[in-house]
Amino acid sequence: MFRLQLISAFFILLFSLSPVSANFDYFQLVLTWPASFCYPKNKCQRRSNNFTIHGLWPEKKRFRLEFCTGDKYKRFLEEDNIINVLERHWIQMRFDETYANTKQPLWEHEYNRHGICCKNLYDQKAYFLLAMRLKDKLDLLTTLRTHGITPGTKHTFGEIQKAIKTVTSNNDPDLKCVENIKGVMELNEIGICYTPAADRFDRCRHSNTCDETSSTKILFRG
């Protein structure tokens, strides 16, 4: 109960942040599909059966902001309850739990590369809480399944995009694909975009890693 109260207090603090002008145009919340990311299976020490956070990226309309000036990542302490919450939403799949929670390599990388670029709006803890809050509002796996897109099946770019747009107020997501097997395009990540205040969805700039033609089927790896 005490842990839940602490987490609730974190979110109350996040919502009470004073508005400040942003130096970026929108956020992209990037969610990774573990079955694709972890292929072949020995690539990951741990994995999830649902989408997990890759990062929350402040972006300009024409380019991504990276490695901005500011204080570098400070590791969260073991007794800090945010680690337990991050472990559920932002899994460091390439590392075992002990190493991941102690060294925090993915969280450090993402904050130093992207999070610092929105420091005028969100400090380190607020940045991570924001990413988790945004993910909590989405259930992309259920959304895809509702539209017949289930793990192990293939669909066109348009079919996947149309399904995701039903939960983004019709704003384009950024579908990100890889070829783990030559000639087989598969869905690796989904980017969902928001205004700097994270109060509304926004349109994502396409990264153009997927074949968007109607003749190509994209694998949603099972």
Curated annotation (Swiss-Prot):
<keyword id="KW-0732">Signal</keyword>
<feature type="binding site">
    <location>
        <begin position="109"/>
        <end position="110"/>
    </location>
    <ligand>
        <name>RNA</name>
    </ligand>
</feature>
<keyword id="KW-0378">Hydrolase</keyword>
<dbReference type="InterPro" id="IPR033697">
    <property type="entry name" value="Ribonuclease_T2_eukaryotic"/>
</dbReference>
<dbReference type="GO" id="GO:0003723">
    <property type="term" value="F:RNA binding"/>
</dbReference>
<dbReference type="GO" id="GO:0005576">
    <property type="term" value="C:extracellular region"/>
</dbReference>
<feature type="disulfide bond">
    <location>
        <begin position="177"/>
        <end position="210"/>
    </location>
</feature>
<comment type="function">
    <text>Self-incompatibility (SI) is the inherited ability of a flowering plant to prevent self-fertilization by discriminating between self and non-self pollen during pollination. In many species, self-incompatibility is controlled by the single, multiallelic locus S.</text>
</comment>
<keyword id="KW-0964">Secreted</keyword>
<dbReference type="InterPro" id="IPR036430">
    <property type="entry name" value="RNase_T2-like_sf"/>
</dbReference>
<feature type="binding site">
    <location>
        <begin position="92"/>
        <end position="93"/>
    </location>
    <ligand>
        <name>RNA</name>
    </ligand>
</feature>
<keyword id="KW-0255">Endonuclease</keyword>
<feature type="disulfide bond">
    <location>
        <begin position="193"/>
        <end position="204"/>
    </location>
</feature>
<feature type="disulfide bond">
    <location>
        <begin position="38"/>
        <end position="44"/>
    </location>
</feature>
<dbReference type="GO" id="GO:0006401">
    <property type="term" value="P:RNA catabolic process"/>
</dbReference>
<dbReference type="Pfam" id="PF00445">
    <property type="entry name" value="Ribonuclease_T2"/>
</dbReference>
<dbReference type="InterPro" id="IPR033130">
    <property type="entry name" value="RNase_T2_His_AS_2"/>
</dbReference>
<keyword id="KW-1015">Disulfide bond</keyword>
<feature type="active site" description="Proton donor">
    <location>
        <position position="54"/>
    </location>
</feature>
<keyword id="KW-0325">Glycoprotein</keyword>
<feature type="active site" description="Proton acceptor">
    <location>
        <position position="114"/>
    </location>
</feature>
<feature type="binding site">
    <location>
        <begin position="113"/>
        <end position="114"/>
    </location>
    <ligand>
        <name>RNA</name>
    </ligand>
</feature>
<feature type="binding site">
    <location>
        <position position="54"/>
    </location>
    <ligand>
        <name>RNA</name>
    </ligand>
</feature>
<protein>
    <recommendedName>
        <fullName>Ribonuclease S-3</fullName>
        <ecNumber>4.6.1.19</ecNumber>
    </recommendedName>
</protein>
<feature type="active site">
    <location>
        <position position="110"/>
    </location>
</feature>
<feature type="disulfide bond">
    <location>
        <begin position="68"/>
        <end position="117"/>
    </location>
</feature>
<comment type="similarity">
    <text>Belongs to the RNase T2 family.</text>
</comment>
<dbReference type="InterPro" id="IPR001568">
    <property type="entry name" value="RNase_T2-like"/>
</dbReference>
<keyword id="KW-0456">Lyase</keyword>
<feature type="signal peptide">
    <location>
        <begin position="1"/>
        <end position="22"/>
    </location>
</feature>
<keyword id="KW-0540">Nuclease</keyword>
<dbReference type="GO" id="GO:0033897">
    <property type="term" value="F:ribonuclease T2 activity"/>
</dbReference>
<dbReference type="InterPro" id="IPR018188">
    <property type="entry name" value="RNase_T2_His_AS_1"/>
</dbReference>
<feature type="glycosylation site" description="N-linked (GlcNAc...) asparagine">
    <location>
        <position position="50"/>
    </location>
</feature>
